[in-house]
Each structure stands twice: as C-alpha cells, then as structure tokens.
Amino acid sequence: PWVGLLLALTQTCSIATLLGLATLRLQGHFLSLSTVAWGLAIGFLFGNVEGLGRFNGIASIPPISFGSYALVSSAQVYFLIWGIVAAVLWIGYNLLDSRLGRAMRALRGGNTLVESLGISAFRIKLLIFVIAAFLAALSGWLYAHMSRFISPGPFDAGMGIEYLMMSMVGGAGSLLGGVVGAAIVTLLKNSVQDYLPLIAKGASGQLEIVAFSALFILFLQWARQGIVPFVGRYLPKLRRDRPQPAPALPRRAQPAPGELLLKVDGAERRFGGLVAVNNVSFDVRSGEILAVIGPNGAGKSTMFNCLTGALRVNKGDIVFAGRSITREAQSRIAKAGIARTFQHVKLRPRMSLLENVMLGTYARTRTGLLASALRLNRREEASAQFEALRQLERVGLGDQMHQLA
C-alpha cells in the first residue's frame, strides 16, 4: 500500500500540473467548467481501461498495514483518517498564515492587486491546484484501502457537486469549514437516505435531490459565507499579540543620486481605433519626482498601466534600471522595483489591515512552501509583521492592525 501511496501522489500531482498549465489561465466560469470537463473526461477514460476493471473497478485491495499490523476494520482506519485530518489542518493553518498563504487568500479579489505586488497569480493558482490534487490523491488512497474496492463511480460529477456543497455549507476559504461542511452534508445525506423511503416509497431518489436543493437555497439565503464564518461573527474574537521588534527585511541595492532609472521612448497604446497614449517619451532619474498632468481621459492611468505591466504598449520601449520591461509580466516588473497605487481601493476586506500591508512584503521575502507549511519561517515572518506594523503606525492605524480591512 505504501508504494501505491507514493505512485498515487506523484502521478496525481504530475497530471494536475499538466492540467493546470493548460487551463489555469482561464478566468471566471470558464475555469470552473474546464475543471468539471476534465473530471468527466478522466472518469470516462479510467472507466474504459480494461486493466483497471473498467466501470466494475478493482476489488481485493489489501488493507493499510504498519509492518505486521494491518488496519482491517473501518474503526481502525477511522483513527488514522482523523490523525491525517488533524495533520492537514495544522499544515493548512500554517500555510494560510504565511507569505504564500496571504498571496493565496488575496487571489480571491482578482489578479490585479497581487500582480502589482510582485506575486505571480498564475504560479499561486497552479500551486493551489497541485496541493488540492495532492490531498485528493491521499484521500483516494485512504478510501481505496478502507473500502478494499475502488471504481470510477464515487468520483463522478454528482460527487463533485456534493464536494462543492460541503465547501459552501461549511464555509469556502475556512479550514474548519471544510471539516464541518463535510460532516453536516454526510450526516444529512445518510439521514435522508434512511428516512425518505419511509415517507415516499419509490421516489426517495428524487426527493433526496429536492431536499439537498432546498438546503442549498437556505444556506445561500441565510449563511452565504457558510456555517463557520456565520457562527464566528457572534463569537468573541481571540486577542492577537502585537508584533515585536524584529530585524529589518533586506532592501534592494539603491541607485546613485541622479542615475537614470526609467526611460520611456515613444510609448503608444491603442484600444481599437482610440489612441489613449500617443508617442510619449520621458526620463526619470534617481531622487527625482515627476508628475504626469492632464484632464480626465487624457491617458494618465493608461500610461501608468503600461509602465507597471497591467497593459502592454503597442509601440515604443520602456527601460527600467538598464533593462527593457516592455514585454515583462506585471509581477516581474513589481519585483524589479516599480510599485503603484490604484484609483479604486483594492484592499482585501476579509484580511486584516496588518495582513493587507504584509502583502507588500512579498517581493522582499523568500520563504517557500515546505518552510511555510512546517512554520520554519518565524524569523522572516516576524520581520514582515513588524515592517507592516511600522507602516500602519505611520498613518495612525497601528492600534487597529487586527481589524478586517
């Protein structure tokens, strides 16, 4: 079974990486539809592989064993599953409370802000996709060795909808919500299957769909964010400590005063037949403040979008610190040192003031996935927290750092 676990994890994560590279650049409902389509296609594929038993599946799967001790009964596997759930929750909490986790949560409001802070939205989405595949592979392995049988049936589109309902009932974006939602939906499903045949003989299958649909509508009406966030609003908030002084984060090399930093040469940006930026050229040197002045609709915001990579110029060249950034991704331009603000506020309302400001330290920090998951990033995290607090205190918001934005 342990070789099977290794193969399941590596193959699933590899396939998820390939599928993610192919589909994660899609936006909105197109992304959701593509993942559903992949699920249907792969389920149909495995259901027609003769070596895997087609839709009849594979039977006589050996139980999970530790040496000579085998977990034969469901009760024995039950405790193993809860141990794994506890470990996943701990790792998930560590990850979401880290540099990468803040970037993941910030994606909930769109790509524009995160890209402007030096965060590659595509890479973070791909990371989330692979982590989800890793957990799915682990769950499938446990399911197969607990049931001693596996087939494509339990992984069809209907189960996908059920998993979505679990997430929404418990609270999407909440670790505890995933567990609570799974427990509620599973218990309700079992109760409905037990009692509906007594109420309506011969029509229990249709009534089960009606019952779950009614439940779904009620949650959308009264607890749209899910049970855990809904209940959390009425519970006393945990008091969080104030960040302690910590070493400063590393700074990039500073240019010499008067050195040429930014050169824009003949920049032009068109939207169909409309020329928003027409043959603009200027230089910006270190220590210099340059203002772009013009009436509404003159193209000022479009020019800034071109400078920061949110838009591409149709003609011309933009050079920063001796390197052309005309075709660079927005996140790479931000990492190079060009920052921006927005006319319309793009704060993340479900993150605290401190966490919102800490997003700005992403390009100056380096902690990766494993260190974040195991909380090996305490020194860097402390520096990022203290830097964010220092900036909040500059504008008089230090006492409200843990308030939601």
Feature locations, PLM:
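Transmembrane alpha-helices and adjacent helix-loop boundaries
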Residues: 1-250
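The feature captures the beta-strand-to-loop junction immediately N-terminal to the Walker
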Residues: 290-295
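Helix-to-loop junction immediately C-terminal to a conserved catalytic motif
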Residues: 308
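Conserved ABC transporter NBD signature motif
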Residues: 316-324, 335-336
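Conserved ABC nucleotide-binding domain
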Residues: 326-327, 391-405
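Q-loop/switch helix immediately C-terminal to the Walker
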Residues: 344, 351-372
